[in-house]
Amino acid sequence: MLYSYFCVLSQKYKRGLLNKVFSNINGNIYPTVYLSEVADFLQGLTYSPSDVSVSGYLVLRSSNIQNGVLSFDDCVYVDKKVDESLQVKCDDVIMCVRNGSKYLVGKTALIPNNMAMTTWGAFMMIIRSKLNDTYIFHYLNSQMFFSQIFKDTGTATINQITKGILNECKLPLPPETARKQISKMLSSFDVKIQKAEKRLTALVKLKKAFLQQLFI
């Protein structure tokens, strides 16, 4: 309960920081470009239940994104030939673009390194930046992005995000030096959140162990 509450608070704080950063960016005179000009959108792998195996290619799904980072608590593997174009790369952004729950649509995680034998499912999309930084990943978590995707309320009111919707999204494009500074600052904040979450998880486990010993 405490851990879940902390995760909600940290994500809300991060969203507030992102909104402040991108509002300031938007206030500057930077050129505005379409997202499709600076990133490629790659649809995921279609597979059948008979392809599922105990080993093979890891298929990233919506359950593999937890609190903005990759989670491997619920993994599915397929024994199937996967084209090189459907293998994740370092700094790819994986996004849930279709789900029965509208609240999961739009959630993202950054691929932190080159993960061998890893692809993504049909309800997911890889957004592969053409820029040499993680600026687009942070943009995809900002209110500026969500207000374009979910135009009515700024939150998910649809159950899918299509390439056509992404093609219409615009973002301010600062010079590379400014983008790298923004990316570095926001990424360092992500690291602090992740470290705090790990410490909290360890404390919760320690408390449970102590209670078990106490009431034996």
Segments from the language model and where they lie:
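Short amphipathic coiled-coil heptad-repeat segments
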Residues: 1-31, 198-216
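Non-catalytic DNA-recognition/assembly elements of restriction-modification systems
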Residues: 15-16, 20-45, 168, 177
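A short beta-sheet element
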Residues: 61-62, 81-141
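Short, surface-exposed secondary-structure boundary micro-motifs
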Residues: 99, 185-187
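A short glycine-rich beta-alpha junction/loop motif
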Residues: 117-123, 131, 153-177
